[in-house]
Structures are given as C-alpha cells and as structure tokens.
Amino acid sequence: MSNNIQFKVQPGGTIKGRIRVPGDKSISHRSIMLGSIAEGVTQVTGFLEGDDSLATLKAFQAMGVEIEGPNQGNVTIHGVGLKGLKKPDHPLDMGNSGTAMRLMAGILAGQDFECELIGDASLSKRPMKRVTSPLADMGARIDTAEGGKPPLKIHPSSDLKGIDYTLPMASAQVKSCVLLAGLYAEGETTVIEPAPTRDHTERMLNGFGYPVQSEKLDEMQTKVTLAGGGKLTAKNIDVPSDISSAAFFMVAAAVAEEADLVIEHVGINPTRTGVIDILKLMGADITLENEATVGGEPVADVRIKSSKLKGIKIPEALVPLAIDEFPVLFVAAASAEGQTILSGAEELRVKECDRIQVMADALVAVGIDAQPTEDGMIINGGLQKAQSAEIQSHHDHRISMAMTIAGLNAVSEITIDDCANVRTSFPTFIELANTVGLNVTAVEV
C-alpha cells in the first residue's frame, strides 16, 4: 500500500439508512490485554480489526499467548494468567497507538523480563512521562528517549508496591496504566482522577472477576482502588460499536439536509457520551433506541436527523468525555449558527498531532473563521458551503475523517492528504461513508 492515500470528497447528497460502525477501539485493546492475563479461554466478538488493536494482539502473541483470529471480529484468547507472559524476542511495536503503549507499560512494569515498546514516527513524539513517572513511584524501572518519549525500555521488576496517585490531568490511559501495574503490586493501588474519564478498564476488570472499587469524591473527582495479587477469570466479551467512529456520521447527519440515520449497537458508556451531550446542547436531533447492557457496557441504536445547530460554549466538564471527538465536533461548530468556544482541552495538542492547530488550519482553508487558543478553539460558524481546498491531515486518522464530513456541504471537491492511518481505527470508513450518502474516493499517490 502506498504511504500516501488521499481522500477526495465530492459534495454529497443527504445521509440516510442504518449502519453499524466497527467495534470500539478502547474495548478491543483491553479485551486482548485482560484476556491474555486471565486464566481460561476468552471469546471476543465485534473486535476492531484496525491496525492499533491488531498491534496489541500481535504483542501478546509475541509474549507467548495463543490467540486465534481475528476472523470477522471473532477472536479466541487462551489466557496464561497474570504471571504467564514470556519475554518476547523482539521489541513490541505499538504502531500509532498511544493507548496500547501506555496500558502495556502498566502490565509490563510488573514482569520478570526486560521488554521494549516502540512505535511509529507519530507515537515516538508523544509524552510518556505521564505513565513512567507513577510507575517509577511503584518501583518500576523504565528508560525513555529524551524528553520522556518512546521507545520505552522496561526492566524486570517483581516487587512493585501499590501507591495512592492523584492524576495531574484527566486521562483514562494513565489511570488504566497505573491500575494494570497495580495488579502486580503489593498492597492497594488507588488512583484519584480530577474529572471523569472512560472507565472501560474498571468495568472489564470487574467483569473478569477482579474487584475494583470506584467512589465518587465529589461532582468531578473519582477514587478508584484495587489490591494486587488477585486473578482474572476468562469471560466472553461482545465489543460494542465505537462511539468515536459513530461520531463522524452523527455530525454528517446533523449537518446534512433531510437526513435520517440510525447507527446500531453503539457503546454509550456514560464516560464516552460527551459527543452526544455536546451535539444535543448545539440543538442536534439525537435519540437513543433499543437501549441494553451487553457485558457490563451500555449500548443503544443512535438515531440522528437533520438539525439546525447553534454555537455554544462547551462545558469543560464534558471535555474529557469527548476528547477524541473534537475534530468532528469542530466541523459541527463550523455549520452551526453563531460562536462555539472550546476551552480546557490542551490535551488535544499532544494527540496523534496538535489537533487544535491542525484543525484550525483545515477549517480556515475551507473558509471558516477558526481561531486556535492555548487550550481550545473559537469558531464563528454559519458556513453554508465549504470552499474547495487541499487539507493536510498530518497522518492523523481523526483529522482525515472529520474533514471528509466537512466536504459533505462543500462547493466542490475537497482533497485530504495522508489518510493511510484511517485504517488504524476505522478500516471500513470510506465504504460506510459512501453507503449512507457521502461521495468519497481513496487514491494512492
């Protein structure tokens, strides 16, 4: 496959139909990790066959775990127990995945073998001190490149100690890393988060029979506690559709004329539904149908119709609950009447790229008044028709997909560069986009 895939987006019709987007990336990663260190056989359905979660799968195979699949989203994991992983004979390549690297660091910190975690050029620029620092407090020994960046060289350690750790930022990845290291630590490990973040790790640990206590300290803070030395028992996992992937089509339907779209079996974990809450505050016509709980995770069909969106000041409490969805929420803001203000989102600057600056540049290129700020953006919306432009995605899958949605209401073709990384999270994106009424082609250049 060519390194440069361009998306060419023609202005399209309306958005209609029923679709199911691929499995949730966060839950897919965790199903492999916990299934591998559980005792017994775990069957996973709905697994996301994207590059990121496949990197996690291959890493555990390299550490001696027998994993069959994926075959149409079905994976069988023959767990080896907490102490059953073997030293891999090569560095473990996490590709583009910050989630994989940070969570794996927690599991590997308590092993009795040395291991190195590496990643692609983008991942190699991302901050890892946020996980290596608390792990060092627990007794782990981890070497990093300059500035606390990957690769991570993790030395053997069999005497981790539990810690009480207050997160300096709301980060599910850091919280999960510390909790996973806590499985291997003596005593209790406690993490206090300053604002709610996704809780898939805690839910899945409880599902595997490993007790985790969560206690609300106040409206924002939560304390999560587990004790080391237990065991995980295999459990089958049905991975719901990824709300982060569904978000692109939610916005597409909201901004298109005469749209009516149903996205099936979407994970609506309350720590992930910030995108729905924000769109509703903007006036989006969104309803949940067929609500159910599957394997401890709430799911529903999400129905979205054409909406007259208005600009809002996005509540900072919702920022951690929609952190991955802001690129496409910026596109919604561009179509909304009035001003949208985002603050408290400095985390966006250290994602796969600086998503604040890159999205501001992309929106300006298509004719939007978008002003980046240190921790967010100010967008003056009301755009009826986006201008034709060539957009630089900076190899960021979510920028590529967000600007594809911006092309729905353009005057003529929008070209987006460097879209190969869309396959990390949403390999069927173009196919589904064209199914519901967009007009997108991928071209190797």
From Swiss-Prot:
It is found in: Cytoplasm. Its main location: cytoplasm. Phosphoenolpyruvate binds at K25, G98, R126, Q173, R355, R398. GO terms for biological process: amino acid biosynthetic process; aromatic amino acid family biosynthetic process; chorismate biosynthetic process. Pfam families: EPSP_synthase. The active site is at D324 (proton acceptor). Belongs to the EPSP synthase family. Monomer. This is 3-phosphoshikimate 1-carboxyvinyltransferase. It comes from Hydrogenovibrio crunogenus (strain DSM 25203 / XCL-2) (Thiomicrospira crunogena). The gene is aroA.
